[in-house]
Each structure stands twice: as structure tokens, then as C-alpha cells.
Amino acid sequence: MVWSELLEILAYSVDCSVNGDLYTNTSGEISTADILRFAEIVEYPSATLLTQNVRQTTPHNKQCTLLLKPFYSPCENNKRKKKSEGERVRSPRTFRGSESLSIQQLEVYRTTMVERRVSFTAQ
């Protein structure tokens, strides 16, 4: 897949807004299926691609950064509000930029209170 095509798919698949997190699949490449699966996980219908954050190093190694806003249901918002009024809330784990985030981990952390930045790297 040509990188420009990938960016186009990325831009239409994920609504952007999850900070310094790195996502690659096992081969280090991003497939259309990965992007569509990621869009499903974050539950956003459209995307805004931050093209100013696309680093063009070589034709085979480019990086694109997306901002992913966590998805909250009204029920989750109510629970969070009650906890913050009374009991102490445990802060969600944040990932360093060098860590690799799997699809399953993204699914777990998509509802954290922290806004994250996810970098997609194609090689």
C-alpha cells in the first residue's frame, strides 16, 4: 500500500484525538484492517489527520500522529462524577512514547480519563 493511500484511509477511518503512545502491528506495518479495527475501538465515525505531525524520513519509514479522545458513555460519566465527589480515584496508567500498544490494550485504555496521543508508524 502506498503511504499516501494509507494516510487517506487513516484520515477517513479514525476521529482523532490517545499522548505519546506508539502503535504498530506485529510486522511493524499498518494495514487497512488495522486502521478500520482501530476506528472501531475508539468508536468515532470520522477523522482529522494531523498532517503537520507526519514525519517523512524515508519512503519506507514514516510516522503519523493522531489525537484520540477517549469515548465515554453517559453511564461512565456518572460513575466518574460520583467517585470524584467522595472516594479517591485511581489515576489511569499512562504509556511512554517508547512503549508499544496492542489493539487489546487500546481497547482497555480507550475509556481512561487521560487524553492520549497515538503514533502510527509504517515501515
UniProtKB/Swiss-Prot annotation:
Residue ranges, annotated region (Disordered): 76-97
Other noteworthy facts: Partially overlaps SCS2.
Protein name: Putative uncharacterized protein YER119C-A
Originating species: Saccharomyces cerevisiae (strain ATCC 204508 / S288c) (Baker's yeast)
Source taxonomy: Eukaryota, Fungi, Dikarya, Ascomycota, Saccharomycotina
